[in-house]
Amino acid sequence: DVYKRQYMLIHSNFLKKGKTSAAPAAAGVKSQSTEDIIINLRDEVCRTMESATKIYDRTLIAVFKENRKVLRDMVKESNDLFYQSRERKYTLLPTLKKLQSSDVNTAHYYVQVVDYLNEMTKALMHITRPAFEHIDNNHEGLSKEQAKDLMSINDDVESIYRHINQMLRDGDFSEIEMVLTLRDQLFESIAEAIKSELSRINEARSNTKASMLYLTILTETKNMVLQSRNLLKSQQYFLKHRTGPQKWIK
């Protein structure tokens, strides 16, 4: 269909761009100081997390309202976010060589941060695409029960991401255990929502296509938050091993 052709075109263009830009990007890394690498990664992590927060929230609201245009925009934005995080892997090796020359531990955590960033944006993309395809194909929207559960989960995700984004911006990780507690509470809510949906399916009280979308959103939300928390933890270690306690933004 049209959407798949558009996606393949975007994907193809990205791969071509990656192949042509990898060499110049690698050359650029050689001229960067270790401090430059840290600052650039910090900025990318903050920017990506803040964008992901907005995309997730707007996607769920657009699903509730069956707003095809907004969902299409969210697919594009999540695609861009994912491919930007993947593109960093083209400069991974020269960056590692640069970091390992001064600190092997820093290089190790850099790899983790890049990987978790990629996995988090991938999970987000696995929410926006099915959501758009569902509405674009004129399938039945979510039920009131499904929408209510997702609105509650959306609020929980927003709370977690607000704390994560604040810690990333301030460079103050003192609330990281609270985020872990909020994450565990969210996962319990997701587990309960899945059980409730399976009961509705067994009782034939739920539309099949809507149920598939709903369960996909729940599963990928869990993946997204899990990777985000891992990302936060690795970013904390990354900074700790390289620079010690400090504020990121003066």
Residue ranges of each PLM-predicted region?
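Cytosolic, long alpha-helical scaffolding segments
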Residues: 1-250
